């Protein structure tokens, strides 16, 4: 968790969101207040802190207007664990498919990665040093003592090829001779000077365990987690370049240097206190007809989500986590249904409502120009790698914005995602030919845009399929 990020004022948070997201000021203000309230809560005494629950947010707006991006960027600002799920992927408890508790387990997995990555960063130098020492031994090996022949009691059960418990890559080696010591010293100097990066070495790496395919998705995952914890890790030999081996070995050594149990406990606390779960397409499980079978199933999913929003103890492979103080953000277009079609108990769990506006021509223009790494800057950077300089005129950008808006009006409104499609189609020929035109300078003008796109954008049938 970013200690500086959580102390940001609402104005600071909105300012950071403005670097990446255009418009939607009301939504930005509300998520900024929700984040600041978490910081305020952390300053209170324990008794008061337990009474204050986060105010969950319901975002209402068509696709492509920034609902997911606002939540994702908000989580990055404070370094909070964030997970996006789709309400339509869940099934009622007892049916085959993902149950709603899986989103909490996924959030904890994200929190564990965040905490461990942070802790690995603190021991990175030591881990790299250990990796370099190991590489020197691999590049200049000495005689190794005979390994123990004790068999693994699980070997016959799992078809062999399981290493003994307690064994690792570093087999005990005999005391190196003076000649080997001298050679290792020379190799170490070359290694640190970066002269051996492409040399091949053989290292042992953990092999991903095979998936269990005979159960439903959720039961499968739980069984897989349990088996992974019980069984020792399979290791296989791979031949890789030194630079790749260093990364793999340094990561393994970093894992050994950090206290795994402490990291897991910190991750559970981080998920509980700072976790953000974004539930997309929540409008698809809303229903205004409780009589049909499909609608009954949707209500079942809503009722399964409800106790998690209220606060439940969920069992994960790292321990039990309490969802009471997690922040939940529901989102949906609500074209067919409306928020009042959600069951009343669930409506009450999303006290903050924010309606996001459809994008205008001006919004599209700003999306193309204002963000820190706008789409146009991305394409310019990509083509610059081929030594092709692309210059977009203001008039061309305006034309692209108008075209994106018009295609959205004439076909399905997919918001800002339409710009990706239009830019990709417009620059398709240039991207293909770029390697054969070094040092070229291409000016993107309104005429260029029209030449590439006008015949398609003005034909509703073509634009529906191509743009």
Swiss-Prot record:
Region (Disordered) spans which residues? Answer: 146-185
* Bilayer-spanning residue ranges: none
Which Pfam families does this entry report, sorted A to Z? AAA, AAA_2, ClpB_D2-small
Q: Which UniProt key words apply to this protein?
A: ATP-binding, Chaperone, Cytoplasm, Nucleotide-binding, Stress response
Molecular function (Gene Ontology), one example: proteasome-activating activity
Detail which positions bind ATP: 22, 64-69, 280, 345, 417
Q: Where is the composition biased (Acidic residues)?
A: 168-177
Q: Where in the cell is it found?
A: Cytoplasm
Q: What is its main location?
A: cytoplasm
Q: Could you provide one GO biological process annotation from this protein's UniProt record? A: proteolysis involved in protein catabolic process
- Give the matching SMART domains: AAA, ClpB_D2-small
Naming one, the record's GO cellular component terms include: HslUV protease complex
Give the protein's biological function: ATPase subunit of a proteasome-like degradation complex; this subunit has chaperone activity. The binding of ATP and its subsequent hydrolysis by HslU are essential for unfolding of protein substrates subsequently hydrolyzed by HslV. HslU recognizes the N-terminal part of its protein substrates and unfolds these before they are guided to HslV for hydrolysis.
Family per record: Belongs to the ClpX chaperone family. HslU subfamily.
- Note the subunit structure: A double ring-shaped homohexamer of HslV is capped on each side by a ring-shaped HslU homohexamer. The assembly of the HslU/HslV complex is dependent on binding of ATP.
What is the name attached to this protein's record?
ATP-dependent protease ATPase subunit HslU
Q: Which organism is it from?
A: Staphylococcus haemolyticus (strain JCSC1435)
């Amino acid at each position: 968790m970013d200690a500086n990020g959580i102390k940001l004022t609402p104005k600071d948070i909105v300012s950071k969101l403005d670097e990446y997201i255009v418009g939607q000021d009301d939504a930005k203000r509300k998520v900024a207040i929700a984040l600041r309230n978490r910081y305020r809560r952390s300053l209170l005494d324990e008794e008061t802190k337990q009474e204050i629950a986060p105010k969950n947010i319901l975002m209402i707006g068509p696709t492509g207007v920034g609902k997911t991006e606002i939540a994702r960027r908000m989580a990055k600002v404070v370094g909070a664990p964030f997970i996006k799920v789709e309400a339509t992927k869940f099934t009622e408890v007892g049916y085959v498919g993902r149950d709603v508790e899986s989103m909490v387990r996924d959030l904890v997995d994200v929190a564990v990665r965040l905490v461990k990555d942070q802790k690995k960063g603190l021991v990175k130098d030591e881990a790299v040093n250990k990796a370099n020492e190991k590489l020197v031994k691999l590049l200049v090996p000495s005689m190794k003592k005979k390994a123990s022949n004790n068999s693994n009691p699980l070997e016959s059960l799992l078809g062999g090829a399981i290493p003994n418990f307690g064994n690792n890559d570093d087999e005990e080696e005999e005391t190196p001779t003076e000649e080997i010591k001298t050679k290792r010293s020379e190799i170490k100097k070359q290694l640190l000077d970066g002269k051996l990066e492409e040399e091949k070495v053989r290292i042992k790496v953990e092999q991903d365990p095979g998936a269990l395919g005979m159960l439903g998705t959720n039961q499968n995952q739980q069984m897989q987690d349990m088996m992974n914890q019980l069984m020792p890790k399979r290791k296989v030999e791979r031949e890789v370049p030194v630079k790749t081996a260093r990364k793999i070995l340094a990561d393994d050594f970093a894992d050994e240097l950090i206290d795994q149990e402490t990291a897991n406990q910190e991750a559970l606390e981080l998920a509980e206190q700072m976790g953000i779960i974004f539930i997309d397409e929540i409008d698809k499980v809303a229903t205004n007809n409780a009589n049909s079978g499909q609608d009954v199933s949707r209500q079942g999913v809503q009722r399964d989500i409800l106790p998690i929003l209220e606060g439940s103890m969920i069992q994960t492979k790292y321990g039990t986590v309490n969802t009471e103080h997690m922040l939940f953000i529901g989102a949906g277009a609500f074209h067919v249904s409306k928020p009042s079609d959600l069951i009343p108990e669930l409506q009450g769990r999303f006290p903050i409502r924010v309606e996001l506006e459809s994008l205008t021509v001006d919004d599209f223009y700003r999306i193309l120009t204002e963000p820190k790494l706008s789409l146009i800057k991305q394409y310019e950077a990509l083509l610059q790698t081929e030594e092709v300089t692309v210059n977009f005129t203001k008039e061309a950008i305006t034309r692209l914005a108008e075209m994106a808006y018009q295609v959205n009006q004439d076909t399905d409104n997919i918001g800002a995602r339409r710009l990706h499609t239009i830019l990709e189609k417009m620059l398709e020929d240039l991207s293909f030919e770029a390697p054969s035109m070094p040092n070229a300078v291409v000016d993107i003008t309104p005429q260029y845009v029209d030449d590439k796109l006008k015949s398609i954008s003005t034909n509703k049938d073509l634009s529906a399929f191509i743009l």
